[in-house]
Amino acid sequence: MSKNLRGNFKWLAGIASVSLLGACGVPGDAASGEQLVGEAQELRQGDVAVSLSAKTSTIGAQERATLSVTLTNTTRHPVRLLKWYTPAEELEEPLFSVTLNGEAVAFEGPHYKRPAARDTDFLTLAPGESLTRTVDLGLYDLSRTGNYGVRFEVEAQKAHGSSAKQGLLKSNDVNVWIEGRASSVQQPSDVTPSLTSSISYSGRCSTTQMSTLLDAMNAGSAMADNSTAYLSTTTPAATARYVTWFGAFSLTNWNTAKTQFVAIKDAFDTKPITLDCSCKKSYYAYVYPNQPYKIYVCNAFWNAPMTGTDSKGGTLIHEMSHFTAVAGTDDHAYGQTNAKSLAISSPTQALNNADNHEYFAENTPFLQ
């Protein structure tokens, strides 16, 4: 899953368009003498407009289900956009609300855990500049034939953590008839993986990597054991550890957290887990939620500590919680600061946020 956006920018919803990510700290329009502050600022409504269009109203089963997305900077100063939540490159997040006959259509793409955004993760639009990209909706479940409704729709809170304003960022609606087709989501490899006990390795893991992954599995399993024991043996109450990561205490929510960690522990203890080393992205790891129990580890994973904040063991907790068959978590907020804020503003979402589970399990700094 995707993570560690540190609240770099603010988002404001548009009416028929959407206001996207914040301003960069560079001089504005020289003619007007406008000067931007050097740090991120909250944008006005409509600073960046997003429009959605389709070339055709009907898409056959053998055709790619594509739409055109245009982002336009409507201001007199440059704006900087985080690529992860734009269609600038490949689609990595559920940026669209897709429905069929009024029912939500599932996003079947991967859930990433990322390190903090770097300069290279942003793009800049000059005043009046537009960026147009063609987006393939193949990561959504288009297996049924019918009239699909599509719009760009991203939660402000999901994009920037709980420090962002509540609400949805929406574009115009587009309706298109799509003939059902097989999923384009990557399926598990048919290649027989190397097997060690209940843990398999694929993606050409080296001997050193397999040893590191086994240590990470042991660390993650120990965290799952500790979390389950804590929630099972501690008298349910507003303890510091619980409230910090899951918000205001209620017995129902405590039991939800316990049920989730019991499932995470069970996955570590009893399920046939595959760890894949093929990912070369700068992220920590990712999973396909409907493909348990395969975890793809990426470059940042190898440099993470074994335990502690954003650790190897914690990364495996994070990814394990994403599986629909385990806890079915999402990514609503990223990083410790935003995860803590999410627990305050929305305990329900905190209980559905992978980072909150990871940080509860890592318990760094230690909370009783």
Region spans (language model):
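Low-complexity, acidic Ser/Thr/Pro/Gly-rich terminal tails and inter-domain linkers that flank the onset
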Residues: 33-61, 74-76
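Bacterial N-terminal signal peptides that target proteins for export
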Residues: 2-13
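Predominantly extracellular/secreted Zn2+-dependent metalloproteases
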Residues: 57-62, 67-70, 74, 86-115, ...
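Bacterial signal peptide processing site
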Residues: 25-28
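C-terminal motif of bacterial Sec signal peptides marking the signal peptidase cleavage site
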Residues: 20-23
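Short, hydrophobic/aromatic beta-strand segments
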Residues: 77-85
